[in-house]
Amino acid sequence: MKQLFATTSRGFEELLKVELTELGAQEAKVVQGGVHYQADDETLYRTLLWSRLASRILFPLIETKIYSDLDLYAAVSGFNWLAQFDERVTFFVDFNGTNQEIRHTQFGAMRVKDGIVDYFERQGKARPDVDKIQPDVRIHAYLNRENLVISLDLSGEALHLRGYREDAGQAPLRETLAAAIVMRSGWQAGSPLVDPMCGSGTLLIEAAQIEAKIAPQLYRLHWGFDFWKAHNQSAWEKVKNEAIELAEEKQREIQPHFYGFDLDHRVLKKAQKNAQNAGVSHLIKWQQADVAALKNPRLNEVGTVICNPPYGERLGTTPALIALYSVFGQRLKKEFCGWNVSVFSSESTLLDCLRMRASRQFKAKNGPLDCVQKNYQVSERKSDAITDEKELEFNRTSEVAPDFANRLQKNIKKISKWAKQQELDAYRLYDADLPEYNLAVDRYADYIVVQEYAAPKNIDENKARQRLLDAVTATLQVTGVETNKLILKVRQKQKGTNQYEKLANKGEYFYVNEYGTQLWVNLTDYLDTGLFLDHRLTRKMIGELAKGKDFLNLFAYTGSATVHAALGGAKSTTTVDMSNTYLNWAEQNLILNDIEGKQHKLIQADCLQWLEKCDRQFDLIFVDPPTFSNSKRMEESWDVQRDHVKLMSNLKRVLSNNGTIVFSNNKRGFKMNLVALEELGLSAVEISHKTLPLDFERNKQIHNCWMIQHI
C-alpha cells in the first residue's frame, strides 16, 4: 500500500474524502487543503483517473525537518532519486511555503533543483534538464515552518485540466470547483438539469460526465507517472480499460436531459465545442436565451436549476446584477415550481435578490474570491407575480418594493410633466419619501442616479441593504431605464472635502439642459455629479439679476451659476474655486454655452484668502460655501455657522453700493446672525422658499438662501 496525498480547494476536503473512499482508498484522513490516504496500485490509478475534486495526487518521498537552506539541500541531495526516475528525464520543482530561513519560494525551488542534479552527478550520471513548460517529472515541495515534505506529483498537470476546454467565457469556473458545485447542488443523476446562464458550459459538462460515467481524466495524454520507475503499466491499463468500457456502456443508456441557456451566442459556441471534446455533446441541448424569458424545458418533470450567475468580479455593473438576480428569482418561481435550485456566487447580498429562502448553503473559494453556494426549493405553487409576458415589465414591480414603486410611479407622473414644461433634463424623482427607503432617485436625461443615504446606526445593515436592492430593482422597472444607465451610489454625511474625492476614473461626461443652458455632468467619477439640482431656481434667479453687472461666483464648484449669469447678460464674471478639477469643468461649461472673452475669468485659489486680497468690486455675488471644511490646502478650518459673519464682512468690502449678495448653504438649522450683519451695515432677507423647486418641495431644509444688501 502506498501513502498518498490528494490536494483540493479549501472547503472540499470532506467531499474529497468521501469520493476517494468510494474509489477504494483506505485510511482516508482529512487535513486542511487535502486528504491523506492509502492505496494499492490499481486504487492509485483509479483515484488519478476518476477523482473529480482532487487538484493533484502526490506520492511523498521525503518528510523531514529543516532549519536552514543547507538542511534543505542535504535532505534532497541525499535521497535516492535514481530509484524514482533516471537522468534522461526533464523535471520541474513546484515549491510552496516559506519560513525564516527559506523566505522565497523561488529560492526554495532552486535549492531542491540543485540537490537533485548534484545527486545525479555524484552517481556519475548526466545532469537532468529542467523544463518549465511540460516536464516529464514534477517534484512538489511543501514547507510549513520547519516541516518539509517533498513528493512526486503523479498527476503531472493539475487535475482540473480535463482537456476538454479549448476556450472559456469571461469568468470560467475551474472544473474541480464545478464538479463540487454539482455534487452539492442536490441534483440526482437521471433528472433534468438546467443552467440558465451556462457560459462555457462547465457545470453541465461536469454533471453530464458524472451521469455518463466518463472518468474526468479519460482523455488525458500525459501523466506525472509516465517516467516513474515504480509505474505499474498493467494495473494502469486495467483501470483505464475498465473506464473506457463503462463509458461506452453507459452512453447507450442515457437520454438527453441537460439544458444550457445563455444570452451570448458566442460563448454558447464555445460550450458546444467543449461538450464535444468531453464526449457529452449528445446529452446537452444548448439555446440562446435571456434569463428574463427563461422557460422550463421539462414542464412535466422535477429537476434542478444550477447556476453560476455573474457577480462583482464578472461582467456587468451593480444595478445590472441586481436586476438580473431579481428577474432570475421571478422566473424560477413562475417556471420551475417544485424544482431544486442551486446558485453559486461571491455576493450573498445579490442572492437575496432572488427573494427565496435557502435550505442549505456551502462556503467555497473561487480563486481569491470567497463564495457561497445556496440551495433552494421552489414552491410547488406557481407564482402569479408575472401573468402575461407582455406585461412583464409592469408587473414585476408589484412583487418587489411595491410601496416604493407606487410612490416613484406617482412622483414620475407629476414631476416629469412639470420638468418637460420647464425644459429640464435633470431633476429629482424621489427623495426619501418613505422612511424605510432612505434614498434619492434623480434623472439626468436618459440616466437614473440612485443615491443611498447612510442608514442610521439603529437600522439593521442587512435589512437596509435588502431594501436598497429592492428599490434599485423597482426603479429599473418603473422608469424603464436600461441597466447600464442606472448609477448606484452610497451617500454619507459629508465631512471636510470628501464630497470632492474621486470615486472612479471613467471620464464619462454628457450635458443636460437647464432653463436654456447646457451643463456638463459626470455621474460616476465623483460623489456629486457636477450639478446641485436643488439650486436650480437660485441659478435661474442669478441669470435674471445679472444683466449689465459684474458677477462673482465664490466657491464656484463647476461654475453652473456663472453660465446662467453670463447668458443673462453679465458685463463680466469671475469664478473662484480651490479645485483645479472643478475649475476646468467650469471652463468646459462656459465653452459649451459659447461664452468666451477676457471678461470671464477663472481663478484657482483658496476662496477666503483670495477674498481678503481682492481689490475690486462686484454688483452681484453668489457664494455657496461648504458647511464645514478642514482641507489641507486651507490655512484654517471653515464652519459656516461660526464663520459666516466674518465672510460677510469681507464680502461687504467688495460689494458695490447697489450690489446684491446671494448667500446659500446646506447646514440644517443654520441661523443667520442678523444683529451682527446689521452692525456691519448689511441687511439679510431669507428667500429659501423662493429657491426651492417642485422636485425638492418635500425637503424644505435641503438648503437655505439669503439676499443680502447694504443698508
Swiss-Prot record:
Disulfide bonds: none annotated. This is Ribosomal RNA large subunit methyltransferase K/L. The gene is rlmL. It catalyses: guanosine(2445) in 23S rRNA + S-adenosyl-L-methionine = N(2)-methylguanosine(2445) in 23S rRNA + S-adenosyl-L-homocysteine + H(+); guanosine(2069) in 23S rRNA + S-adenosyl-L-methionine = N(2)-methylguanosine(2069) in 23S rRNA + S-adenosyl-L-homocysteine + H(+). GO terms for molecular function: 23S rRNA (guanine(2445)-N(2))-methyltransferase activity; RNA binding; rRNA (guanine-N7-)-methyltransferase activity. Its main location: cytoplasm. Residues 43-154 form the THUMP domain. NCBIfam families: PRK11783.1 (NF008748). Belongs to the methyltransferase superfamily. RlmKL family. Keywords: Cytoplasm, Methyltransferase, RNA-binding, rRNA processing, S-adenosyl-L-methionine, Transferase. Signal peptide: none annotated. Specifically methylates the guanine in position 2445 (m2G2445) and the guanine in position 2069 (m7G2069) of 23S rRNA. It holds the Pfam family UPF0020. Gene3D superfamilies: 3.30.2130.30, RNA methyltransferase domain (HRMD) like, Vaccinia Virus protein VP39. GO terms for cellular component: cytoplasm. It comes from the Bacteria. Its EC number is 2.1.1.173, 2.1.1.264. It is found in: Cytoplasm.
